[in-house]
Each structure stands twice: as structure tokens, then as C-alpha cells.
């Protein structure tokens, strides 16, 4: 009788501990938020692939990225075409040397429709727009709005908060795959997030 009681008690304790652990485990949303908050910023090289819905590589690219939280980023593409995207937290500049044009937007205006902004800021309300799941170091974000035109957004970030890359999966099945290398943690200098319009360049100001 004592053996049976001990076995039952042990089983009950195991079940209780398992339930307690599961109940207190961080949700995927909380875990992703925690990892993103571990580092104030980083810089890295990136490589890019665009894969068609049929599985063919239709474009490849490379460049550098610099991020400082909250809301500062510099995205410089060096191949196949040179262009630059810079945000100081309020204004966003998109510069294309080839066509000698700078387009200017309010950052909110340009980024409110993309989860890329989650890599650059830590705003609680952002997370309400997505259903988040986790598989290892990969977090998948799916928009909750029924009428959303966004597809899925996947972030690869390790337990130390180092972002390894991200994927954008459109609703039609096209994929944009971005992989980071030579990641350096720490906030880049503030002057990396400012932009001066070069002389002779056409300005397309979309702020309203």
C-alpha cells in the first residue's frame, strides 16, 4: 500500500511540476520581445535572395545593415544596384544614386505596414497585430487582421539576442530571404542615422 501511495504521490507531483512549468513558460511573443531587448543595436553584412512561388531564385543582393533601438536604422544595398535607406526615428530617406533621386517619408508612414519595424523598436502595441509562434531560434509572425495584405515574417534570433536574419513570405508564396553575417553588437554612432541630400539630386518629398 505504501509503495502504491508513494508511486501515486510521485506521479501527482510530477504532473503538478510539469503543469506549473508550462504555465510559467514565456510565450513566443514574450520570448521574442525579451531577445530583441537584449541588445541596443548592431551592425552586420547581409545577403538577400528572392525566391519565386515556383522556387526559382529571381534576385540576389548584398549590403550592410545598422540598427540602433529605438527606431534608427541604415540599410545600404551594394549589389546588384546601389541604394540607401536611412531613418533617424522620425524621417526616412530612400536614396538611389543611379536615378539621382531621394524620396523622403515619415517613418511611421513608410514602416507601419511591415514587421521589419519590430527589429528597430520595442513597442508593446506592435505585438498585438501578429500571432507569434516559435521553433527553436525562429519566430514566425502572422498578421491577425483578416484584411491584411501582409504575408508571414520570420525572425531568426538566438538566445543571446543576436539577429541572424529574417524572411518575408508574401501571400502569393514569393519569399525574401535575408541572412546576416559579421554581426557586431552595440549601438552604431548617431551620425550613421542622418542623411544630407547630395547637391543636384532630385527630391521627392512624400511627407504630408
Curated annotation (Swiss-Prot):
Keywords: Chaperone, Periplasm, Protein transport, Signal, Transport
Gene3D superfamilies for the chain: Lipoprotein localisation LolA/LolB/LppX
Coiled coil: none
Record carries keyword Transmembrane helix: no
GO CC annotation: outer membrane-bounded periplasmic space
InterPro entries: LolA/LolB/LppX, OM_lipoprot_carrier_LolA-like, OM_lipoprot_carrier_LolA_Pbac
Any single Pfam family the record assigns to this protein: LolA
Signal peptide boundaries: 1-25
Subcellular location: Periplasm
GO biological process: lipoprotein localization to outer membrane; lipoprotein transport
UniProt KW Signal keyword: yes
Subunit structure: Monomer.
PANTHER family according to UniProt: OUTER-MEMBRANE LIPOPROTEIN CARRIER PROTEIN
Role this protein plays: Participates in the translocation of lipoproteins from the inner membrane to the outer membrane. Only forms a complex with a lipoprotein if the residue after the N-terminal Cys is not an aspartate (The Asp acts as a targeting signal to indicate that the lipoprotein should stay in the inner membrane).
Family under the similarity heading: Belongs to the LolA family.
Record HAMAP family: LolA (MF_00240)
The protein, known as: Outer-membrane lipoprotein carrier protein
Organism of this sequence: Vibrio parahaemolyticus serotype O3:K6 (strain RIMD 2210633)
Gene: lolA
